[in-house]
Amino acid sequence: LPGGKETSYKMIVIGDPQVTNAYSPYYTSPDDNPIKKSDVERFTTQTMADIKQTIRSLPAGTPVYGLSMGDDVQYYGGYNAKLERQIRQALGSSEMRLFSVIGNHDQDGKALYRRKWEENFGPTDFSFNRGDVHYVCINNCFFHHGMAYYSPGELRERQVKWLRQDLALTPKDMKVVLCYHIPFTFGNA
């Protein structure tokens, strides 16, 4: 990332793309006939096209960052290296620098999936500063006994220790934004 303190930037937040290697009907207007498009094609031609248009609408030189809030992919039938490559290419096809939080569908309770995600996107727990904001991105999706993830989200003791150390080094005048995939509470609690 560029050095120095930015006083103004834009953060585009992407929620739950869940791009799959499956095919589904998508419509672009009520008059369209249903056509089959892959999720990757839909994400590239619709979602990323909208993001690129948003970036073009900003004043020239505005720093732009993206933050995917997890579930970049949805695996059906096991890990899919081609799908990972395609979503990385799609997400990297604009001028924005992208950060990504891991979601439950990015790992599906499999150590292999989590390792592959880390190889492709980086660590599952990290932080960065932009302007006067300290962003903390953390994995809060854990699977129990290889089964479905537990909701609400939770943190492991090692993460709490890391978070305390991270925040201790953060200037007290900075805002802190905690980024994670699933809610930490049930309902209205």
Task: Name the predicted role of every residue range.
Residues 24, 29-37, 75-172:
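Extended active-site neighborhood of metal-dependent phosphoesterases/phosphodiesterases
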Residues 43-66, 92-97, 134, 148-189:
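His/acidic metal-ligating clusters that form di-metal
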Residues 1-80:
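N-terminal active-site segment of His-dependent metallophosphoesterases
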Residues 13-15, 65-71, 97-104, 138, ...:
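Active-site neighborhood of phospho(di)ester-bond hydrolases with catalytic His/Asp-centered motifs
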Residues 17-19, 73, 106-107, 141-143, ...:
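Short, solvent-exposed loop/turn segments at secondary-structure junctions
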